[in-house]
Structures are given as C-alpha cells and as structure tokens.
Amino acid sequence: MKTFDELYAELTRKVQERPEGSGTVAQIDAGVHAIGKKVVEEAAEVWMAAEYESDEAAAEEISQLLYHVQTMMIARGISLEDVYRHL
C-alpha cells in the first residue's frame, strides 16, 4: 500500500529515469491534453462506481483518478506542496 506522497515520489522517479515500456512515461509524453482526457474519464468512472458498484470498485476507481491527477501535476511541474497550500 502506498500513500499519496509515496505515489507522487514513485511517479516522479519514473519520469526522471524513463524506464522502457513505462505507461507513466508514455502518458507524460502524450501531454497535458491527453492526461486531461484521462482525468475526466476516470472522474466519470468514480462517479459511476460510487453510484452503482461496491465500495471496493469505487476505491479502485478513485485510486486510478489519483494516479492520473498526479501525472497531470508532474506534467505541469506542480508539486505536492503547491497543492497542499490550497487545502
């Protein structure tokens, strides 16, 4: 199990190291527009899972949304601290 901060650190490391075949690297390379489409898609899936599926399914969809939001943050150069200042 990972925390939000640990996931951000892992994704940042992957983007810096650029391992071959990394989905994270591919998503970053696709750009903000493509990442934004994934964020919207995952947000809709969270909503549908919360309305019609189990808590486990909703939690899985939320985890995927958090992943895509973090890739957006990395693509834009937004740190966790930048976000935490607004909480």
Swiss-Prot record:
Catalytic reactions of this protein: 1-(5-phospho-beta-D-ribosyl)-ATP + H2O = 1-(5-phospho-beta-D-ribosyl)-5'-AMP + diphosphate + H(+)
Protein name per its UniProtKB record: Phosphoribosyl-ATP pyrophosphatase
EC number(s) recorded for this UniProt protein: 3.6.1.31
Species assigned in the record: Micrococcus luteus (strain ATCC 4698 / DSM 20030 / JCM 1464 / CCM 169 / CCUG 5858 / IAM 1056 / NBRC 3333 / NCIMB 9278 / NCTC 2665 / VKM Ac-2230) (Micrococcus lysodeikticus)
EC class of the enzyme, as a word: hydrolase
Compartments it resides in: Cytoplasm
Lineage, highest ranks first: Bacteria, Bacillati, Actinomycetota, Actinomycetes, Micrococcales
Pathway: Amino-acid biosynthesis; L-histidine biosynthesis; L-histidine from 5-phospho-alpha-D-ribose 1-diphosphate: step 2/9
Origin: domain of life: Bacteria
